[in-house]
Amino acid sequence: MIITIDGPSGTGKSTVAKALAQRLKFNYCNTGAMYRTLAYTHLQEPWNCLSIQELIDNPPFSFSFISEQPLEAFLDGHRLSEELGTQEVANAASRLSQLPEVRSFMHKLQRKYAELGNCVFEGRDMGSKVFPDADVKIFLTASAEVRALRRLKDLPKGSLSQEALHAELVKRDEADSRRIHDPLVIPEGAIVLDSSDLTISQVLEKILALVSPEMP
């Protein structure tokens, strides 16, 4: 069974998808972390001297595909975690995700991960492009103001103002929605959930109610 959760940044996709996978005992894939891994790598020496094509042809990074464990990213043997959460990396990932060769590379890895079996995938084009035949497709949304507040809590204190982060989110939304290759859209057949006034637990329960009838 494949469940996809798409939507813009700050809607709670990652938290909800991870909690959903834990409740269902499914595999969980944070596809945004995959793009951020590539972006982080390209920002570091000596890999910042390579082209993107060279990086994806012979990637120094890797991902763990282990059943019933969240996907983890490694660079040169070092597990990446907090390094992927900076705004600099997020902005770089947004730029790189516009490239068709990058999207094609990531889509192949994501479909490979799906071979593990029951999976929850979260991202921006999971239900529209990578898994159009997913069993359950969710599109999470929220107001830009709420999303900025949520993202602010995840960043180091004083790194960005709420106003600056709000502007970054609006800019990212526009780039994601207007990109030529695999833009951010509501997938056909997806259920749209607005999380602006909902807690993570409330969103999770709503999704579980949608998933339960589809369970084998």
Swiss-Prot record:
Primary enzyme class: transferase
GO molecular function: ATP binding; CMP kinase activity; dCMP kinase activity
Organism (species): Chlamydia felis (strain Fe/C-56)
Protein's name according to its UniProt entry: Cytidylate kinase
Enzyme Commission (EC) number: 2.7.4.25
Cell compartment(s), UniProt: Cytoplasm
UniProt entry keywords in alphabetical sequence: ATP-binding, Cytoplasm, Kinase, Nucleotide-binding, Transferase
GO CC terms in record: cytoplasm
